Amino acid sequence: MSDTAVDASVEKTTKDLKAKEKEVVEEAENGKDKPTNGKAENEENGEPEVDNEGDEEDEVDEEDEEDEVEGEDDDDDDEVEGVTGKRAAEDDEDDDDDDVEIKKQKTDEDD
């Protein structure tokens, strides 16, 4: 009987997740932040929208700054890879210690 209860809760959770996923997809397609009537958010609140061209320039500057920050992150990745490469080289040295020493075979000429 407990199996049935578990199955029902799993089905419910699965349905909830599918419904939530559908909502998220619809919001992404429709643009959740966009007003449904096409007006700016300030106009909906009764405040007139002010057209500031300076704001647009600020937005461009912010995007440039974000690109620069992303570029800095790439440098960090290179440093991490470099450190990893050094560790790999150190590991190779340790492998030499584990190698079995090769002994020469005696031949008739050695006697």
Swiss-Prot record:
Q: Quick one: where is this thing mainly located?
A: nucleus
The UniProt GO MF terms for this protein read: histone binding
Compositionally biased intervals (Acidic residues): 43-81, 90-100
This protein's UniProt keywords: Nucleus
List the Pfam families.
Prothymosin
Q: Which GO annotations describe the biological process of this protein?
A: negative regulation of apoptotic process; positive regulation of transcription by RNA polymerase II
Which residue ranges have biased composition labelled Basic and acidic residues? 9-42, 101-111
**InterPro entries to which the protein is assigned, alphabetical:** Pro/parathymosin (IPR004931)
Cellular component annotations (GO), alphabetically ordered: nucleus
List the residue ranges of the region (Disordered).
1-111
Location comes to: Nucleus
Protein family (similarity comment): Belongs to the pro/parathymosin family.
Task: Please state what the protein is called.
Answer: Prothymosin alpha-A
Organism the protein comes from? Xenopus laevis
